[in-house]
Amino acid sequence: MGLLGMVGDSFGCSATGERLVSAARDGDIQEAMALLELNPRLARYSTFGIRNSPLHYSAAKGHHEIVSLLIESGVDINLRNCRGQTALMQACLYGHWKVVQILVLFKANIHKKDCFSGATAIHFAALKGHTRCLRLLVADYVPSLPEFWSVMHAKCTDETNKEAFDAVALRRLINNKSDGGVTPLHLAALHGHAECVQLLLDLGASVSEVTINDGSTIDLIGSGSTPLHYAACGGSAVCCQLLVAAGANMRAQNTNGLTPLMVARSWHKSSVEGILTKRSEVPVRILPSSYLSLPLMSIVKIARECGWRKTSVSSVCHDPCAICLDTECTVSAEGCGHEFCTKCALYLCATASSSTSIRGVPGSIPCPLCRHTIVSFVRLTSTTPIKELPWTNKSLALCAAGASTGSKYAGPAAITSSKYAGSLHRRSEMRSLRSSSVDLGCSSFRTASSGKLSSIKLNCTGADETMPCLVNCFRPDVQRSSSYRERIRRYSQFS
């Protein structure tokens, strides 16, 4: 009976975890809230086989509200599935820029690589040509400086501006190679994503990087190929023109002795043969990408320091945001001085195209009110930084099941249990949550509340590691029950 009891508990937790997975996949925010209120450790649940967590499913489907809810519930933002892919990679693969924006604000790791191809999130964004996702990924590396484009293209003579940011780190990030030496520029050029190629070139992508034969990939074009070889194979005339204008060598040969022109002929891409035959006598002018967004770094920093959620206008003395007309202004644009809320400013930086602005600084975005160019945002003096990030103690608030009512921050998961009790049909568990003792689900720990906090490790279903979680405890000498030890002893006899 001990073994059967443990199996029953496992199936019970799996069933509840599958409900959270379904809610994350379908975008049912209320169901996800209620399930996480009952058991916050379900955020780390993963399905069998592919081991996709609810965070992976919600990111792949573009449900940014559920992504934010899961992160605030204490889930590891860099959790991997069986392929080694994170939620950020999935969001970039399917082009959900709102999810990418939330993950970047929560400081997701953009340097992680998947286990099968060694690709990063930038590789996935370049593969599908999701330029908005790409510029959000480099938000912490592209400074809000008017001289950025000139410095990256070696047209700036002021040494002070060159030292204002780390251009080497940005180039290293953009030219990061996956298995086989493939860079994001290779992938964007192969699939004909011209806007993505132009943005990568503005960010310092190298046109001379070549692929290698490391035995991990099958390169049909041939190792030693440059991005121009890949563009010739893909047959994109615009990508070939951009690469040639950026200084790509049209006579470069790969290990098979093929030039880009030979590659184009072998793949029957006659549309690019004229571009690759001879260099044009009239040099092509390199224009800045319309997806380059300089103010993005400044507004991301402000959002992390002061929050980006809606804050209703507290009094008539504060003017609402001119865009949403619902939220108090928190930032102002340098130059024109127009004020916006942080959420609207983030939306402008993520979606605005610099091609619609007047002639000015490359990478600036137009002000929606006066069309003046915006290079950076500054925080208003009335905007105060938040004392505590909303995701730092959310696991404590959830495990306490409403014990943190005195907290200044109340996340979306901190809701009353009775609101969604009818949809869950778990009234017995709801009563236990309302009481002072907290049932930890699959674990046999029993806790109560006291003035001090005890740190214990909870083994999460579907996770490959333990996650420390703080819970309120009546007694400092919390121990496992004798029935639990008896079940473990009986279970060991079967193994």
UniProtKB/Swiss-Prot annotation:
Which pathway does it take part in? Protein modification; protein ubiquitination
**EC number(s) per UniProt?**
2.3.2.27
Q: Which SMART domains match?
A: ANK, RING
Do the record's keywords include Ribosomal protein?
Answer: no
Please indicate if the UniProt record lists Transferase as a keyword.
Answer: yes
Annotated Pfam families:
Ank, Ank_2, RING_XB3-XBAT31
Q: Which UniProt keywords apply?
A: ANK repeat, Metal-binding, Repeat, Transferase, Ubl conjugation pathway, Zinc, Zinc-finger
Give one GO biological process term. protein ubiquitination
What residue intervals correspond to the zinc fingers (RING-type)? 321-371
Q: What is this protein called?
A: Probable E3 ubiquitin-protein ligase XBOS35
**Organism in which the protein naturally occurs:** Oryza sativa subsp. japonica (Rice)
Question: Gene of origin?
Answer: XBOS35
